[in-house]
Amino acid sequence: MSTVPARIEPVAPLAPQAQDLRCFNTLGLASHAPAFVALTEPSQLPALSALAPRFRQLVVLGGGSNVVLPASIDGLVAQVRLPGVRLVGQCADAWVVEAAAGENWHGFVTACVDNGWDGLENLALIPGTVGAAPVQNIGAYGVELADRFHSLTAWDVKGGRWVEMGAAECRFAYRDSFFKHQEPGAWVIGSVRFALPRPWQPVLDYPDLQRHAALDGAAPTARAVYDAVCAIRRAKLPDPAVVGNAGSFFKNPLVDAGTRQALLGRFPGLVSYPQPDGRYKLAAGWLIDQCGWKGRQLGAAGVHDRQALVLVNRGGAQARDIMALAAAIQGDVERRYGVRLEPEPVVVPAR
């Protein structure tokens, strides 16, 4: 972790205003922020550091695709909209590409594929922004952000400084990172750099992906993998613009080999995936489906009828409805399998 030399530039002012957040979260939950600011340039970050102590809490938003927002937020909400994508450099074994935190993640992946900067195609169509991606260490179809990560710059809100972090400082794990264990609002990611491998090799660990990416027996290209991932996700997952959702709501639980073997003895159809450390990742969607939750509804919240991992807003849902449904699912899964499901989204407190 190293401090980035301060840039000499004027401090852009921030003037908080009230904001309806219904369109700022993909679950479409009714939420109100009495104090809201949009961060559109790095020079605004010092002003954010000066402003934040006046409020009970600082809530940093990206695309709002991995959050559960309360009806009202007692604090300052800052949405990161920093723009920009550039090729930083290239060497024999990698392209180094940088994207600002406010860039749409899928748009960034598409730009990389279009430019021949291959390696992120398995992560296509994941909602959200570039800045939120390292926080969650997003992953799909055999690739995690950590696999392609180079470094990032983040603003230390209390310290009032830019800090550069490598993979070791970010402490990536399954859907986890350093940032998820810090005080909320302590850091604002400004930009992320990716090391995209040269030569490129496809990652086709999932059977669905193998079938979709095969083109007349020819070796798949990054574009073919990208198209396959998009097709699979569109077939399985609801569009947040049509049905409010936050993508996969639960992490796939990790268990040791003994626990997995005991579960297989009772449930022969158990879906699991071996991990490099000897543990097994259980398919949370399968566990939920087997408990009979797929397609069910509890109040204004429901479980998607094609993907049991996805909780949806059936219209007018609030945070309490989503969390009540999540708790009911967790209880049923734990009673049947002895496994506790952990939610993926950040649940923002009202205060």
Curated annotation (Swiss-Prot):
Subcellular location: Cytoplasm
EC numbers: 1.3.1.98
Every FAD-binding PCMH-type domain range: 29-199
Gene3D superfamilies per UniProt: 3.30.465.10, UDP-N-acetylenolpyruvoylglucosamine reductase, C-terminal domain, Uridine Diphospho-n-acetylenolpyruvylglucosamine Reductase, domain 2
Record has Transferase as a keyword: no
Catalysis performed (reactions): UDP-N-acetyl-alpha-D-muramate + NADP(+) = UDP-N-acetyl-3-O-(1-carboxyvinyl)-alpha-D-glucosamine + NADPH + H(+)
Sorted UniProt keywords: Cell cycle, Cell division, Cell shape, Cell wall biogenesis/degradation, Cytoplasm, FAD, Flavoprotein, NADP, Oxidoreductase, Peptidoglycan synthesis
SUPFAM superfamilies named among the record's database cross-references: FAD-binding/transporter-associated domain-like, Uridine diphospho-N-Acetylenolpyruvylglucosamine reductase, MurB, C-terminal domain
One Gene Ontology cellular component: cytosol
Taxonomic superkingdom: Bacteria
Family of the protein in this entry: Belongs to the MurB family.
Main function: Cell wall formation.
Protein name as annotated: UDP-N-acetylenolpyruvoylglucosamine reductase
Lineage: Bacteria, Pseudomonadati, Pseudomonadota, Betaproteobacteria, Burkholderiales
